[in-house]
Every structure is written in C-alpha cells, then in structure tokens.
Swiss-Prot record:
This is Immediate-early protein ICP-46. Belongs to the IIV-6 393L family. The lineage of its organism: Viruses, Varidnaviria, Bamfordvirae, Nucleocytoviricota, Megaviricetes. Keywords: Early protein. It comes from the Viruses.
Length: 395
C-alpha cells in the first residue's frame, strides 16, 4: 500500500505521493478530497528525463513549455473560504523549502503586492485578510489555480534576483481536469504571467531548443501529452549544476556535505562556485572552520590540554583512544560518516570557532535577509521580541 504524505483540517485531506513513489502515482500530488469528492487536484508529478524525451513520445501531440524554478502555491474556494496550499500542506503559512519558515507565503504575498494596485488592494500592513481579499476581487470561485512563485532565497540553479509570479494552470472540479490555456487580469489591469506553449515541429528542433537554454534562467522543458501526463526534460548543463546542488535545501549544508566526498565533492564544489556568486566565499569560510575544529581536537593529544564545553564527547573519545599518528584520519572519518542532520548540529555546536559574527553557520538560508515589517507582523519570532520593536516610541 502506498504511503502518501497527507494533511487534514476542516474535513479536507490533501495527499501527495513521496518522491520515490511518484512514478507509480503521478496524479497524487496536491490532491484535495472531502470524503470521496475531489475538491482540487494539483499538477501531476512529472516524469523526469535527462537530455532527451522518452522514446516513442510524439512531440506533435504534446504541449511544450519552458520549465521554471519556483514553489507551487495552489488556491481554491471551498466551504466558505479561500484555501492556500502547497503540494503537501493545506496551509502555506509556515511552508518553506530552504529559507526561513513561511517563505512560500511571504514570496507569494510580496508578488501580489507588486502586481495588484488599485483602490481595492490592501493598504494596511496589519490586516491579515489580504490574500482572501485578493482572491475575492480577482479569482473565480468555481476554479482552482496553480501559481508558481519564484524567490531568490529558494533558488536551486536559476540565478534570477527578483521575485516572480506565474499562473501555470486552472483546475475545473466539474470536469476534474486542468486547463493550461488560461489567463488572469487583475482589477488594476495587470496581467499575471502565464507560460505560453512553444512551437517545435520535430525532435531535432526540440533538442536544439533544449541545448540552447541558459540554466541560469530556465530549468528545462515540460511536455504535456493528451492524457495530461507531464514529462520534464533537463538539459545537460542544468543537470550538471543540479547534481552538484544535490537535495540539500541550504547551499551551505551542501558545501559541508561535499567537503567530505573527496574528488567527486571537489568537482561539485567547483561547479557550485562557478554558478553561485556567494558559494566560493562560503566554501573558504567553511574549510577554515573545519580546520579550526580539527585542530582543536588534535590539541587534545597534548599533555596539558583540557576539553572545552562545546566539544563532542564521542569525538574526544575517538581522538584519545586511537593509535598515535592516526588522529586526523579518525577525525576525517568521523566527519565523513555523519548524516546531514548530525553534521548540521555538529557545526552549530562548534560555531564559536567561526569567530566574530558566526550567525551564518546556523542561518536558515545561504544569505540571511533583513526582516521586513510584514515579516514581523505575520512571522514573529516565538519570543516576540521583534514585535516589541514595532511599538517602541523613542523620544
């Protein structure tokens, strides 16, 4: 039996097939049910191929689109309210990929603010009804909407520096189907960007188009056949960066992982440093911290050395118990065999060795961005200290 990721509230259940089962259940993605009734259906899991479409697929029978990076935000009306979902969660309030909690919602709202500007648009920073108000004014309650929001914090390979909103499809629950020939003009006259199909006559034209893509701008090509099966074709340049990027949401965590992978890791690091402007500096800082950590544990072999409170007991035992002369090898092996979670916790525990401002060691994103007033209102820290700053009156 399939083990779907689910979330339930107010009588609705959203289901999504995990990545390792997506090829078996491609349509189980942001599938929202109320009992046996389909309320909303997200876009299906794409069948991913590298450098060429699957053999036998008739391109002339498919819709062809450039693919873009971004987070999917699903919007629909049900039970007297607007719902804003990810593919796995019925609420986007705290959903994020690599950045701080709530980054999906933050990016979505920021894009709407830039685009929707008339006398009905939101003006009060403290009004939390902005998204429902936007939907009431601009969306059709009989349709569901699949938006893609891109935020530089959430980028994988593409290097766009501005937030961007696209409408990918609408969903008609009466026919249980998606429409890709859609449009959305806001009450202020602004048109939301909708990707348009590309006219490619044959496989030769398709491959030429794929190979000419800039991985800093687009993420391959999506093919949609007559049965609404999605195929995502990735060009070689994009896959090279994607392989180096790995499945780590945070670029810094990926760097720490690659540092322990020998020649293969070094090759991936070079790719990342070539594509991400901040990667080389992050890499140099990470290597420096790693060497400081190693040296602190090597110092334990000195007669007058004393352990520090932030040191890991297990690694201290390994260093003191190993054969003389093998200490560095044992430390390297210890770091190499850590899981991602263990490595992240380890570097956080040793953050004091980074010197000065060491917040980058434990930050939630490669580059920690300053909080906006919206962040303080909608995503206050648990201790609410930042919120207090909003109401301080200074002479």
């Amino acid at each position: 039996m399939a083990n779907f990721v689910t979330d339930s509230r107010n009588g609705l259940t959203i289901s999504c097939a995990p990545q390792d089962q997506s090829h078996l259940h491609p349509t189980i993605r942001a599938l929202v049910m109320e009992g046996d009734s389909v309320i909303f259906r997200g876009l299906p899991h794409p069948d991913i191929h590298r450098e060429a479409p699957p053999a036998g697929l008739r391109l002339k029978d498919c819709l062809v689109y450039d693919s873009y990076e971004g987070a999917l935000v699903n919007v629909f009306w049900h039970g007297g309210q607007w719902w804003f979902c990810t593919n796995k969660k019925l609420s986007i309030d705290r959903a994020s990929w690599s950045a701080s909690p709530g980054s999906f919602k933050r990016a979505f709202v920021n894009c709407l603010r830039k685009m929707w500007r008339d006398d009905r648009s939101w003006a009060d920073l403290f009004d939390r009804s902005y998204m429902p108000s936007f939907c009431d004014a601009n969306l059709d309650k009989d349709l569901g909407y699949v938006f893609m929001v891109f935020d530089p914090e959430e980028r994988i390979v593409c290097s766009d520096t501005e937030q961007r909103l696209r409408l990918l499809a609408t969903f008609d629950r009466c026919t249980n189907s998606h429409s890709y020939e859609c449009s959305l003009t806001l009450t202020c006259g602004t048109e939301v960007e909708v990707p348009r199909p590309i006219c490619l006559k044959n496989e030769r034209e398709f491959l030429l188009h794929l190979r000419s893509q800039d991985p800093c701008r687009v993420a391959g090509v999506v093919l949609i056949d007559a049965l609404d099966i999605h195929y995502k074709i990735l060009p070689s340049e994009y896959t090279k960066v994607l392989d180096a990027r790995g499945e780590q949401p945070r670029l810094l965590n990926r760097m720490f992982q690659l540092m322990e992978m020998g020649p293969e890791g070094e090759a991936h690091i070079e790719v990342l440093c070539r594509y991400f402007s901040d990667a080389r500096v992050a890499m140099e800082r990470a290597w420096d911290v790693r060497e400081r950590i190693v040296q602190c544990y090597l110092d334990l072999t000195e007669p007058d050395s004393e352990p520090q409170v932030w040191m890991t007991r297990r690694l201290m035992e390994i260093v003191r118990g190993c054969r003389p002369g093998t200490e560095r090898t044992m430390i390297d092996e210890f770091l190499r065999t850590m899981t991602t979670g263990q490595r992240k916790a380890f570097y956080k525990k040793h953050a004091c060795l980074a010197g000065g401002d060491n917040a980058w060691i434990s930050s939630d994103a490669p580059i920690k961005q300053a909080k906006t007033v919206q962040d303080l209102v909608e995503f206050p820290d648990d201790n609410c200290q930042d919120m207090d700053e909003l109401f301080v009156v200074r002479a």
